[in-house]
Regions:
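Active-site region of the double-stranded beta-helix
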Residues: 1-12, 24-186, 194-236
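Conserved beta-strand-loop-short alpha-helix elements that form
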Residues: 189
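Fe(II)/2-oxoglutarate
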Residues: 170-181, 197-297
Length: 297
């Protein structure tokens, strides 16, 4: 997707937004037909989809319906007619984590995640021409935007200078680093934390896939440290008197001190940065009931 990764990592990764034009067009892992199919299936449910108009998320009832099953009502199922009507009226359709249900996108995200050693999630955006889905905002991920159909005009600001920022809407995004139109077949890289916004171009319906490369942060470091503190430590749950409570406190402190004395920042960072690679042996028919039946014949 990035061609030779060395120049990209040296000059763009985490530094600047960049439009990539692969010499051989990428095969689209998903298409609008797939979107129509899953909408029509009746099984897609909030929060896997959201409809946004003029920068604001619509109420779920405006694009979903309620299903009655086993004497109960279940809300939040995508209503294809309502969704299509909102898109025709200028709203943006957002589909989250499609790697959960679309096999081609899951394989694509797995390959990218294996190459980068990171967790990769996939989001779809369908935006009418001349319309903006979201105002300027920051994402807690590096993003590769695969423009699959139509085009979008992007405005991307400089990435944060330090770690004191938050994901979400950004009222003061700072100076613009890149303003460009991304066309079908092109890939846009947006560095983690760089505020950005986009408007559907005049080429018709814009359809793009955002591959978000998740990065660990302070929260992950804390969680890993807490996991290690609890690992291999057996303490009484309810000490019965002050003396036992003090002994328990001493054991707890001694355990933590030993762990901290042996743990390095590099080891802690490596623990949260490591993402298991997809298991090739578990792929294909072995993940299906049909494959299971065949294996037992």
């Amino acid at each position: 997707m990035v061609g030779d990764p060395a120049p990209f990592l040296a000059t763009a990764w985490r530094r600047r937004a960049l439009v990539l034009r692969p010499p051989v067009p990428l095969a689209a892992p998903v298409g609008l037909v797939d979107v129509d199919t899953v909408l029509a299936s009746g099984l897609l449910r909030v929060p896997y989809l959201e409809v946004v108009a003029d920068g604001k998320a619509l109420e779920q009832s405006e694009y979903t319906s309620t299903r009655h099953l086993v004497d109960r009502n279940f809300r939040g199922y995508a209503d294809p007619d309502k969704v299509r009507g909102h898109v025709e009226s200028g709203a943006t359709l957002v589909m989250r984590n499609i790697e959960h249900w679309h096999a081609g996108t899951a394989a694509f995200a797995d390959r990218l995640g294996a190459e980068l050693g990171r967790r990769v999630e996939a989001f779809l955006f369908v935006t009418p021409p001349g319309r903006r889905g979201f105002p300027a905002h920051r994402d807690d991920a590096d993003v590769f935007v695969l423009q699959l159909q139509g085009g979008k005009r992007w405005q991307i600001h400089h990435p944060p200078a330090d770690g004191n920022w938050r994901p979400g809407p950004e009222a003061d995004p700072g100076p613009v680093q890149l303003e460009t139109t991304v066309h079908a077949g092109e890939v846009l890289y947006v560095p983690r934390g760089a505020a950005h916004s986009a408007v559907g171009h005049t080429e018709g319906l814009s359809f793009h896939l955002s591959l978000t490369v998740r990065q660990p942060g302070t929260g992950e470091l804390r969680a890993e440290l807490a996991r290690r503190f609890a690992e291999g430590l057996v303490l009484p749950l309810l000490p019965i008197d002050p003396a036992e409570l003090r002994r328990t406190a001493q054991e707890l402190l001694d355990h933590h001190r030993r762990l901290l004395a042996a743990l390095t920042p590099e080891e802690l960072c490596a623990a949260v940065e490591t993402v298991p690679r997809p298991d090739a042996d578990s792929a294909g028919d072995r993940r299906t009931l049909a494959g299971l039946a065949t294996a037992r014949d």
